[in-house]
Amino acid sequence: MNRNTSSLWADCLLQLQDQVPADKFQMWLRPLQADISSPNQLTIYVQNFFSRQWVENNYLADITKLARQLTGNPDFVVKLVEGVKPAPKQNNIVTTKQNAETAVDSEQHLQSVEFKTGLNSNHLFENFVEGKSNQLARAVGIKVANNPGDKTANPLFLYGGTGLGKTHLLHAVGNGILANNPKARVLYIHAERFVQEYVKATKLGAAENFKKFYRNLDALLIDDIQFFAGKELTQEEFFNTFNNLFEGEKQIILTSDRYPREIEKIEDRLKSRFSWGLSVAIEPPELETRVAILMKKAEERGVNLAEEVAFFIGQKLRTHVRELEGALNRVIANAEFTGKTITIDFVRDTLKDMLALQDKLVTIDNIQKVVAEYYRIKVSDLNSKNRSRSVARPRQLAMALAKELTNRSFPEIGKNFGGKDHTTVIYACDKIQELRETDSSIQEDWSNLIRTLSA
């Protein structure tokens, strides 16, 4: 493979992996092969007409844009061709022994990153922004990277809502394991891709090869394990693979959008094994972390983002990291296009549709309804003067959630809880913060409520 082809297509894939949902990336983009057929054209080979139509309709424009950016050639063309990439002729690729070795090294590197490990080398602990919402998960991830197979965190089960950094952390752990042991057999794979590979291997009579491959790994990292739901044969195979790896003290890391016991249509024996090691939640980032993420991402883009602007965006958008990054990308793109300075007013105008939607998503009324339903009490109880523990604690949680998830002031929140004084709201927020650090049941309730309200 031409060295330029290797680096160009690898760079395209790495950037697309951050832009395209993981399941879609694994299914449609990762398997594609490419070749530079001329100085101004990248040819991408697709399996069949259906694949060609799908890639053309959904991803070709983005791929072309990336290729032009990476080559600096505004006329660069990306062409889709049905079929298998032809084997290169040696004399068309290299003219000297040194160039041949470079081409082979490049090919081996691409295969190692994209097809053998599946890891994104850009996702590291160093650029994973840490905050209270993910502090424990990151610390455990580093521990696993330094000591894979330790039964105190094997399997490691990371769970939380979409866009909170689970996939980034999963790659960071895998890259950390490889940094400590470059010969380790580490594989990252999305659960849906695992299912597809197993079905394909079974149909082709290659089930034994499939088993041998997965059971000889040193670390298996599976993203979005909830995709195994309802797939009984895949669950059976994974159950046996899990046992084999665990008994061999090989590391298993799984992610899901929910706590292991909450995943529906997964066999109980698998759920039990998911809980053998350590399950760690990743929560929606608190304000300080949201601001830090925005500042970090802007710095990576070479953009000087004022802290007050980052605070404004962080206060307004409270759901997940992916939304923050999307908002920041829109702001930067608009600023580059218009030549304007990024100010709070500029951001307010650029993101007016997102901000309006966010204001509608979480209200104090919504919070009260969700909390009341969760604790099986009435909304009127939250607004009453009832000080019994069964009502007072949910009321404090609801007040703290209102402060976390809305832009309302302490007096405004108090007014919406039966006219409570703002000092009562401040006390409630401080109390819940204290209990979250000392009482695991309160932390679990908080996490469950945050996930429900952020869904």
From Swiss-Prot:
Q: Name one GO cellular component term.
A: plasma membrane
Which sites bind ATP?
163, 165-167
Primary localization: cytoplasm
**Cellular location of this protein?**
Cytoplasm
> Which residue ranges are recorded for the region named Domain IV, binds dsDNA?
336-455
Q: Where is this region: Domain III, AAA+ region?
A: 118-335
Question: Keyword set for this entry?
Answer: ATP-binding, Cytoplasm, DNA replication, DNA-binding, Lipid-binding, Nucleotide-binding
Q: Where is this region: Domain I, interacts with DnaA modulators?
A: 1-82
In residue numbers, the region (Domain II) covers 82-117
GO MF assignments:
ATP binding; ATP hydrolysis activity; DNA replication origin binding; lipid binding
Similarity comment text for this entry: Belongs to the DnaA family.
List, in alphabetical order, the GO biological process terms annotated in this UniProt record: DNA replication initiation; regulation of DNA replication
According to the lineage, what is the superkingdom? Bacteria
Q: What is known of its domains?
A: Domain I is involved in oligomerization and binding regulators, domain II is flexibile and of varying length in different bacteria, domain III forms the AAA+ region, while domain IV binds dsDNA.
Alphabetical list of PANTHER family matching this protein: CHROMOSOMAL REPLICATION INITIATOR PROTEIN DNAA
| SUPFAM superfamilies listed in its UniProt record | P-loop containing nucleoside triphosphate hydrolases, TrpR-like
Query: How does this protein assemble?
Result: Oligomerizes as a right-handed, spiral filament on DNA at oriC.
Question: What's a Pfam family this protein contains?
Answer: Bac_DnaA_C
Function recorded in the entry: Plays an essential role in the initiation and regulation of chromosomal replication. ATP-DnaA binds to the origin of replication (oriC) to initiate formation of the DNA replication initiation complex once per cell cycle. Binds the DnaA box (a 9 base pair repeat at the origin) and separates the double-stranded (ds)DNA. Forms a right-handed helical filament on oriC DNA; dsDNA binds to the exterior of the filament while single-stranded (ss)DNA is stabiized in the filament's interior.
**What gene does the UniProt entry assign to this protein?**
dnaA
- Give the protein name, as stated in the record: Chromosomal replication initiator protein DnaA
Per the UniProt entry, what species is this protein from, by scientific name? Answer: Actinobacillus succinogenes (strain ATCC 55618 / DSM 22257 / CCUG 43843 / 130Z)
